[in-house]
Design a protein with these regions (language model features):
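Conserved, well-structured interaction surfaces
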Residues: 1-46
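A generic secondary-structure signal for well-formed alpha-helical elements
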Residues: 15-19, 51-58, 150
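A generic structural signal for short, non-catalytic loop/turn and secondary-structure boundary residues
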Residues: 16-17, 73, 94, 124
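Generic beta-strand/beta-sheet core signal
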Residues: 24-26, 83, 145
Length: 171
């Protein structure tokens, strides 16, 4: 199912729109059998980063994983831009998974995902996520982690994981 993905989406929207809120993403340390991830110490550290950066003056401390911002399409490939990933994104050598892509028919297919470590588009050099699918020649919509459980594989280079995201609001 996708009910947990919708819950994570609501949490992300709340974090982005409500003052004095934060979020520690746990997609990379979750559990298939419970909503309560077993890695409590790591969750506490991630929440501490947020508090230190936002409330205690440690303004240069990374405190959030990549948050979907926008995408550009070039040659039927989707180049995904993120907030909180100024230096780029990484999978730390793990295969990227959980990405999907759709065209105007709004039918999602598993996407081939890669990271270009030297991408530059008028910005400083940084790594960027690239999505494509042979089933979707004209991509319009993307999403990541749109299932109840996924093993997160996308991080910013500072080591914080990305939450589920989607580029649309039609369902």
């Amino acid at each position: 199912g996708t009910s947990q993905a919708f819950l994570r989406d609501a949490q992300l929207k709340t974090m982005l729109s409500v003052k004095n809120t934060g979020m520690a993403v746990t997609l990379d340390i979750g559990s298939k059998i419970t909503n309560h991830p077993p890695e409590k110490l790591l969750i506490g550290k991630r929440l501490a980063y947020w508090a230190l950066a936002k409330n205690y003056g440690f303004n240069t401390l990374p405190y959030s994983g990549p948050v979907y911002d926008s995408f550009d399409i070039k040659n039927n490939k989707v180049y995904v831009n993120f907030k909180f990933a100024l230096n780029g994104v990484t999978s730390y050598g793990k295969p990227l998974s959980g990405f999907e892509i759709a065209g105007k028919d709004k039918i999602f297919y598993s996407a081939d995902a890669s990271i270009d470590p030297h991408y530059s588009a008028g910005r400083e050099n940084r790594s960027i996520l690239i999505l494509s699918s042979k089933h979707v020649p004209n991509p319009l919509y993307i999403r990541y982690g749109w299932k109840n459980y996924i093993e997160g594989t996308l991080y910013n280079v500072e080591g914080l994981p990305a939450s589920s995201f989607r580029s649309y609001n039609f369902d």
